């Protein structure tokens, strides 16, 4: 595994995305559209500074952060909530904790070979996404 997450990543699989969205109280119609979409992630990393773009035909979401620095995040690309977000390194894995209305919310992201792995968590729901480097 490596800490380098730079690149353009295309989604290969998206397991339990609907369960994750239900845990976030996302409406039925939006969930039905979102589960059918393929996402592309564009990550620009300079040390601990990240600029991330998640693009699909339905919605795009940009997230810029510095590892170890808590910030206010508006999750407008997903459920429209305001959360306090902190991203840290655990070995070569980015670990994000999002404090707010929903319990046990956050994500883990890491690279192995030409694959980017992302686990999204809310409550007892875990969505596992795999992306391949383009």
Swiss-Prot record:
Keyword Transport part of the UniProt annotation: yes
Tissue: Expressed in prenatal liver, intestine and lung, and in adult intestine.
Cellular component aspect of the GO annotation: cytosol
GO MF entries: binding; enzyme-substrate adaptor activity; lipid binding; molecular carrier activity; retinal binding; retinoid binding; retinol binding
Keyword Transcription: no
Keyword terms of this UniProt record: Cytoplasm, Retinol-binding, Transport, Vitamin A
Compartments (UniProt record): Cytoplasm
GO biological process: retinoid metabolic process
InterPro entries: Calycin (IPR012674), Fatty_acid-bd (IPR000463), ILBP (IPR031259), Lipocln_cytosolic_FA-bd_dom (IPR000566)
Domain notes for this protein: Forms a beta-barrel structure that accommodates hydrophobic ligands in its interior.
Name of this chain's protein: Retinol-binding protein 2
Organism the protein comes from: Mus musculus (Mouse)
Top-level taxonomy: Eukaryota, Metazoa, Chordata, Craniata, Vertebrata
Gene name for this UniProt entry: Rbp2
């Amino acid at each position: 595994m490596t800490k380098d997450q730079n690149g353009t990543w295309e989604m290969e699989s998206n397991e339990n995305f609907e369960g994750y969205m239900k845990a976030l109280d996302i409406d039925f119609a939006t969930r039905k559209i979102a589960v059918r979409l393929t996402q592309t992630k564009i990550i620009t990393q300079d040390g601990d500074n990240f600029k991330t773009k998640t693009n699909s035909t339905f919605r795009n979401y940009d997230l810029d952060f510095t590892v170890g620095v808590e910030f206010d995040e508006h999750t407008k690309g997903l459920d429209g909530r305001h959360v306090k977000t902190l991203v840290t390194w655990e070995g070569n894995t980015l670990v994000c904790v999002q404090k707010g209305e929903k319990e046990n919310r956050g994500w883990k992201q890491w690279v192995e070979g030409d694959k980017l792995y992302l686990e999204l968590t809310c409550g007892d729901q875990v969505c596992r996404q795999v992306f391949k480097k383009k």
